Structures are given as structure tokens and as C-alpha cells.
């Protein structure tokens, strides 16, 4: 699952993402290797602790982040939050939370982008296109597999922000002018 809808009202849309089953399975698998190495080795206690700690470190490093996206019309802001257990442990609980705040009126488009994921193929993510010309992904990592889940979230955000209604009159007149000037349509 790409993102889950936590709350949805007329003025607030709260989306969340937690590490998936693949991520947790990888954590358990890597940690099991460390525990097995410690249990079955004839090494000293220090080495056994090293095996478990090393595998725990690698396992947590491969754990996906917790992510949130909060679209709030009352404050006029989009808040994108990321929590990383790996960063939290690495900095001894001083860091681990990243937050990006964007004004709602700066969001011009919401689209789905395809990203190549090493060894696994293609992943998909929602990207916010801003008035400043920048693009910012809604989440830090792409989801594997079903593009339809990601497209559903993009449509949900587009309808919440009413972006489909924001086509300017100049764009409409330009598109109608180009259709009128098309020789194929003047038969």
C-alpha cells in the first residue's frame, strides 16, 4: 500500500505510510542471521554481541521510513513529515524527523512518476509540482508494483485541492484557438 488515508474532511486530508511487510520481513531475516551466528558460534561474548549488533544495524538501515502528508486548507499548508528509525539511532535520538512545509496555493499539479528501482524494476510515486518550478515527491521512496494505488492517491489529492478546476481562462482560449486553426477540423 502506498499511502493510507488517516482522516479526510473538507478542510483536511491526512495521509500516512508505515514500513510494509517486505521491510519488516527483511528486518527479521537479517536480525535472525545475527542471532543464529551468535548462538551457534563458539566465539567470546564480545564477538556474539558484535554479530547481533551488526546485523541489527544493517536490518534497521534497510527499514523503510514512516511518512505523513497533511494537506490543511485552514492553515493553507502542506506538511510532509518523515521519521527514520535509522537516523534516530545513528544520531543517538537527536535527529530522525524531517519536515517540509509548502503553501497550498503553490501546488499547481499532482502527478505520478515512474522511478527505476535497482534490482527490482519500476516503482511509482506521487509528485507535487509547485508554482516555483520545483517538484517534490510526496514520499521519499517509490512503491513497487501497482501503479493504480499511486494514481488513486494522486486523484484524491487533486480532488481535495480542486486542481482540476484551476485551468486558467487563457489556457482554455488557447486550446480552443488551436482547435479552430486545425485544418483537419475545418472540413
Swiss-Prot record:
One of its GO terms (cellular component) is endoplasmic reticulum. Coiled coil: none annotated. Pfam families: Cybc1_Eros. Induction: In macrophages, expression is induced after treatment with IFNG or a combination of IFNG and Salmonella Tiphimurium. Highly expressed in macrophages, neutrophils and monocytes. It is found in: Endoplasmic reticulum membrane. Keywords: Chaperone, Chronic granulomatous disease, Disease variant, Endoplasmic reticulum, Immunity, Innate immunity, Membrane, Phosphoprotein, Transmembrane, Transmembrane helix. It comes from the Eukaryota. It is a single-pass membrane protein. The modification Phosphoserine is found at residue 168. The chain crosses the membrane at residues 20-42. Its main location: endoplasmic reticulum. GO terms for biological process: innate immune response; respiratory burst after phagocytosis. InterPro entries: Cybc1 (IPR027846). Interacts with CYBB; CYBC1 may act as a chaperone stabilizing Cytochrome b-245 heterodimer. It is linked to Granulomatous disease, chronic, autosomal recessive, 5: A form of chronic granulomatous disease, a primary immunodeficiency characterized by severe recurrent bacterial and fungal infections, along with manifestations of chronic granulomatous inflammation. It results from an impaired ability of phagocytes to mount a burst of reactive oxygen species in response to pathogens. CGD5 is an autosomal recessive form characterized by onset of recurrent infections and severe colitis in the first decade of life. Belongs to the CYBC1 family. Functions as a chaperone necessary for a stable expression of the CYBA and CYBB subunits of the cytochrome b-245 heterodimer. Controls the phagocyte respiratory burst and is essential for innate immunity. This is Cytochrome b-245 chaperone 1. It comes from Homo sapiens. The lineage of its organism: Eukaryota, Metazoa, Chordata, Craniata, Vertebrata.
